[in-house]
Structure formats: structure tokens, C-alpha cells
From Swiss-Prot:
GO BP annotations listed: fatty acid biosynthetic process
Keyword terms: Cytoplasm, Fatty acid biosynthesis, Fatty acid metabolism, Lipid biosynthesis, Lipid metabolism, Magnesium, Metal-binding, Transferase
Places the protein is found: Cytoplasm
Keyword Lipid metabolism: yes
GO cellular component, one term: cytoplasm
Name of the featured protein: Holo-[acyl-carrier-protein] synthase
Stored InterPro entries: 4-PPantetheinyl_Trfase_dom, 4-PPantetheinyl_Trfase_dom_sf, ACPS, Ppantetheine-prot_Trfase_dom
An MF annotation (GO) of this entry: holo-[acyl-carrier-protein] synthase activity
Length: 134
């Protein structure tokens, strides 16, 4: 069953300006080590960071908290499954919020899609509760 849905749309130029203005202070505050390594290796760093920023916003909306109630930027990170499919890895307050949302004897599956088409980046997150086979 679906227990959370979130979406976000962001202007890549806004993220680019934040990177230019604040540099690593911005990227280290908002992004995990994995996200920074992935984005720094990209030709268009701003678009890569913008997609991940949108994913965090969408995930926080799917959690029903936004960036509040103990959910912080670095509690949510975009990671890739072995297949290459992106998903969200949650820690800290985001992981605690997700655990509180889950019905008993269920596990979470977080579905993520991210895209960009300059000047926009977009993300959708669906959080699904799946029964644990017993």
C-alpha cells in the first residue's frame, strides 16, 4: 500500500548559484558523501545536485514532514541499486519518521524517479509499505 507521495520541481540555475556563492558549505550541508562524489564527477554538476535536491524535497513531502520535525537534508540521500535504479537511503530523523509510518509487519520500499531538462530538475517519490513474509 502507498503510504507517502511527494514531488518537487527546481530551477537548476538556483542550485548553480548556491554552489557558486557558498561552495562546499552548501554541498556539505545538504548532500551526503555519496551524493557529492557522484555529482562532482558529472559534467553538469549543477543539474546533478539539483536532481538530488529535488529528490530530498520530494522525499520529505512523502514522509509528511517537509524539512522539519527532526528530518534534515543529510538524513536523505539518493543512492543507486545494483541495477542502476535510483532510490532514497534514509538515516537519522528521516529513518525514524519512516519507521513510525509503517504498519506492523511491513517494510518500506521507496520508489524514486529523477530527471532534468534545463533549466528544470524534477523528482517524484512514492513510499510503499510491503508486508513482511512470515
Amino acid at each position: 500500500m502507498i503510504i507517502g507521495i511527494g514531488s518537487d520541481l527546481i530551477d537548476i540555475r538556483r542550485v548553480e548559484k548556491s554552489i557558486e556563492r557558498f561552495g562546499t558549505r552548501f554541498t556539505e550541508r545538504c548532500f551526503t558523501d555519496i551524493e557529492r562524489a557522484k555529482s562532482e564527477g558529472r559534467k553538469n554538476k549543477a543539474a546533478s545536485y539539483a536532481k538530488r535536491f529535488a529528490a530530498k524535497e520530494a522525499c520529505s513531502k512523502a514522509l509528511g514532514t517537509g524539512l522539519a520535525q527532526g528530518v534534515f537534508w543529510r538524513d536523505m540521500g539518493v543512492v543507486n541499486l545494483p541495477s542502476g535504479k535510483p532510490t532514497m537511503q534514509l538515516t537519522g530523523g528521516a529513518a525514524r519518521r519512516l519507521a513510525a509510518m509503517l504498519p506492523e509487519n511491513h517494510r518500506a520500499a521507496i520508489h524514486l524517479t529523477i530527471t532534468d531538462d534545463f533549466p528544470l530538475a524534477q523528482a517524484f517519490v512514492i513510499i510503499e509499505a510491503l508486508p513482511i513474509a512470515g
